[in-house]
Curated annotation (Swiss-Prot):
Residues annotated to bind Mg(2+): D8, E57
Molecular function as annotated in GO: holo-[acyl-carrier-protein] synthase activity; magnesium ion binding
Protein name listed in UniProt: Holo-[acyl-carrier-protein] synthase
Major place of residence: cytoplasm
Purpose of the protein: Transfers the 4'-phosphopantetheine moiety from coenzyme A to a Ser of acyl-carrier-protein.
Cofactor(s), by name: Mg(2+)
Biological source species: Blochmanniella pennsylvanica (strain BPEN)
Length: 125
């Protein structure tokens, strides 16, 4: 049974502008430690950050809580399996909320163009 669906789209130019004005503040706020290491070594870090931001917003929408209602950016991690498929890993309060809601499966897909990054998430019980 589907618990929630979330989608988000991010203007990559806005993320680039934020990075230009405030450095890595946004990245340190939203990325997990593992994601941070990848971000710092990416050829196109702006696209990476935009996709992670969109993904985490989509997760919060699928939970039905939004950010800061038991779901926080750095407690959601997006990684790729050995075939490159994006996967979700939850930590701390966000993981506890998923357990409380009896979530069994989490699905995510990411996409980007030169201008936009998009994420779509389905959470199942």
């Amino acid at each position: 049974m589907i618990h929630g669906i979330g989608i988000d789209i991010v203007d990559i130019r806005k993320i680039k502008k934020i990075i230009t004005h405030s450095g890595d503040k946004l990245a340190t706020r939203i990325l997990s430690k593992s994601e941070w290491k990848i971000y710092k070594n990416k050829k196109h870090p702006v696209h990476f950050l935009a996709k992670r931001f969109a993904a985490k917003e989509a997760v919060s929408k699928a939970f039905g809580t939004g950010i800061n209602q038991g779901v926080t950016f750095n407690q959601i991690e997006i990684f790729n399996d050995k075939l490159g498929k994006p996967m979700l890993h939850l930590f701390s309060c966000t993981a506890l909320l998923a357990n409380k809601l009896s979530l069994k499966k989490m699905h995510i897909t990411l996409s980007d163009t030169n201008s936009y990054a998009c994420a779509f998430v389905i959470l199942e019980r």
